Amino acid sequence: MEYAAEEHSNMFLESRDSEGRPIRWSATHRARQRLRHRGRIIATWREALLASGNNTPGLRVVGAIGPLLDQWVDRGWGGLSFRMTQVMTGHGNFGHFLGRIGREQDSRYHHCSAGDDTAQHTLGECPAWADEREALVRLLGRDLSLPAVITAILEEERSWHAFASFCEKVISQKEAA
């Protein structure tokens, strides 16, 4: 929001003459200015995300979305559900996260013999979710790393919905267990 506020302020100032009176811009010029400022907002945001280093909360998501920020912002479909956000960030019903915040004794997995219950294990490996995953793989392909998933869900709306469906089904079952 801070980047948008700064660019809106810059656009306002550019639309005034030296005495503060409004400059009459054509609709085409105004639209070009908005696009230019929007591009600067996204570029500034991307730079800040990528420069934030390894101390950034959500580093996994920043690494996956950062290079595709334009496409992420411009996608014409899909909002993030609570459960999609959990899978993307790893913050949610995962032993690794719950152990780290003191909600569970350790990070073990409750649905298979894996030693560490992470979002990536749930998304790409756990045999407990093989049926749910197969529908996802048919649309997105075998690479279910977060960067590959983000790329796929930004390419097609049906891929977005498949990922959303996987997250809803699997996380709701994990919550019920």
Predicted regions: what is each one?
Residues L68, W72-A177:
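Family-specific functional microsites
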Residues M1-M88:
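Acidic catalytic cores of enzymes that act on phosphate-bearing nucleotides/polynucleotides
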